[in-house]
């Protein structure tokens, strides 16, 4: 039986790192993607030492940049003949003020939605080479709300929590569209709820929310990672899940998902030239 090839973006910290630790105990070949090289190499080393499992690789990439997403996908295609599992978990310290990347995209939109849209697309052949490929989009906030396309990147009005919720909604619509478009791949959308990670103390507003309410209702990264690994290793049907793997109803319309796909294709074309 072949060992699984598992790619985890954001696998160097928080929920992503906890997911990687669990997969290491299964003997899977792990590829961790993260922006900070020192943190990434340290995380890979820690997982190797704690699990006794040597097949843990780290790829440095700033996934807020589409050029880096493409470069990462190319490296993966050259080095691995297939990808059995792709876990999108990259995030980071959410900015209080609207922040724009070097390619002109709002940062939260770029990292938590657009990079996922593009990386999955770039790896379709790698996923298609696996016998039972699975993709998990991990995203907090959001719901099945209507997308305000004129403000999809906070162009008219930006606030941090609005950006987080917007990214959650976009991930929901992305999963809905992918499930229809690529029936040979199983897609999961998992909302972990409030999780005790470094992100919750990344700025004063996050820390305030965490200290007032989060301590009572939050979960650990290990608890959230257990849900994700169960989804991906057991025979759970594709779809939408919350904490403790409670099923969520996909009440979004296919029209909204299609509109987002068209918007994303056009945006990608404008950036790529």
Model-inferred region functions:
Residues 1-31, 37:
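Canonical Rossmann dinucleotide-binding motif of NAD(H)/NADP(H)-dependent dehydrogenases/reductases
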Residues 63-79:
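Conserved Rossmann-fold cofactor-binding substructure of NAD(P)-dependent oxidoreductases
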Residues 51-55, 74-88, 94-100:
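A glycine-rich helix->loop->beta "capping" turn
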Residues 49-67:
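Rossmann-fold cofactor-recognition segment
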Residues 185, 189, 211-270:
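C-terminal helical subdomain
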Residues 91-92, 96-98, 106, 128-184, ...:
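Catalytic loop of short-chain dehydrogenase/reductase
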Residues 120-121:
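A short, exposed helix-loop element centered on a Lys and neighboring polar residues
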